[in-house]
Amino acid sequence: MKNQKIIAIYGKGGIGKSSTASNVAAACAEAGKKVMIIGCDPKSDSSITLLRGRRIPTILDLLREGVDIKKEDVVFEGYAGVKCVEAGGPEPGIGCAGRGIIVAIQKLKSISGNLLKEQDLIIYDVPGDIVCGGFVAPVRKGFVNEAYVLTSGEYMPLYAANNICKGLSKIGMPLSGVICNSRNVSREEEIVSKFSEEIGSQLMAFIPKRQVVQDCEREGYSVMEKAPESDIAEIYRKLGKAILENEKRVTADSLSDERLRELTK
């Protein structure tokens, strides 16, 4: 049986989840793995840099329009063969995005045959600063078997990461690791490494802040496609390899607010 990795990446809004998820997906696909990325954000932008800036229809939008959805309507092949899917979100002010994800993924499973089972790695790019009832549903439904938290070394992203760890632990979902997407703050790698250690997990990667990431995104590309020789591309390759090989899964502890403030001073 295929040793399939199905991961969710959580973190504070705006911390760089979609950028990290899409570049890791591309890096793993370049290494010969079958990869799918499933965007779960109402903005439906998780796969945009794998598709050269193209936005694709979301499952929930098509369902609302009454379309008889087929696999080719919602699964698109992006850079390096990454399969790209956008679940979409509810209409503004109506419904729960988390529960919408469940509807979308169940629909995807029903129309895609063995496509999901054939993947070596499936990445769920999950929105939100907290693990609410809706957003943990993919975990409870068994869609996901590993969780990663993305943060920087600043107080608010760490506060969100800490809350996410608390929420995951409450539902019995192990944490596989922490990823630091740098904002160039003082002692950042040290802070996030210490945070990871104190919650019982591990720092998977420190991704330095580089202008090339924004430059590539502005043009509609992933770093892996547009700047493959950059130091950031190499970091994404190492992170992808580390995720594929990672076997560590812990029920994460969470820190007190006082300890978080102490860490980030």
UniProtKB/Swiss-Prot annotation:
It catalyses: Ni-sirohydrochlorin a,c-diamide + 3 AH2 + ATP + H2O = 15,17(3)-seco-F430-17(3)-acid + 3 A + ADP + phosphate. Keywords: ATP-binding, Iron, Iron-sulfur, Ligase, Metal-binding, Methanogenesis, Nucleotide-binding. GO terms for biological process: methanogenesis. Its cofactor is [4Fe-4S] cluster. GO terms for molecular function: ATP binding; iron-sulfur cluster binding; ligase activity; metal ion binding; oxidoreductase activity. PANTHER family: LIGHT-INDEPENDENT PROTOCHLOROPHYLLIDE REDUCTASE IRON-SULFUR ATP-BINDING PROTEIN (PTHR42864:SF2). Involved in the biosynthesis of the unique nickel-containing tetrapyrrole coenzyme F430, the prosthetic group of methyl-coenzyme M reductase (MCR), which plays a key role in methanogenesis and anaerobic methane oxidation. Catalyzes both the six-electron reduction of the tetrahydroporphyrin ring system and the gamma-lactamization of the c-acetamide side chain of Ni-sirohydrochlorin a,c-diamide to yield 15,17(3)-seco-F430-17(3)-acid (seco-F430), the last intermediate in the biosynthesis of the coenzyme F430. This is Ni-sirohydrochlorin a,c-diamide reductive cyclase complex, component CfbC. It comes from Methanosarcina barkeri (strain Fusaro / DSM 804).
